[in-house]
Amino acid sequence: MKLNEIKQIDVGGDLLANYWPEDEYCFSEWVTLSIGVKGEEGSTYFNLLVCTPEWISRKLDSAQSVWGRHMLIIRKYDTELIESEVNKKLQELLEIFTGDDDLKFSEKIARYAHWEYEDYVSKSL
């Protein structure tokens, strides 16, 4: 099996399509990506900070720096663009990943979106 389908993108438990920021040119919002196997139940969850350059600029007005891991930076809020970019990245990863191991594939996705098991180390007794 390989995670190969975006099942849902949501913001705070609500569908991305139902969310709209106060300022579409200056916002940041964590979205949850539910990624699973097409035609099967279940998903693995990843989090991604979607933000604009203007939001980053305003953060820099009050801070010396802004860290940038697990971010998708877009010019203005656009649900279709967000969905398209997330799907495009998943397809790019599917094309270069030849294995069939969901754990290893999740580690690849985690380079772009935070995965709850990222850096998890199993402790044997």
Residue ranges of predicted features:
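C-terminal charged interaction modules
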Residues: E92-L125
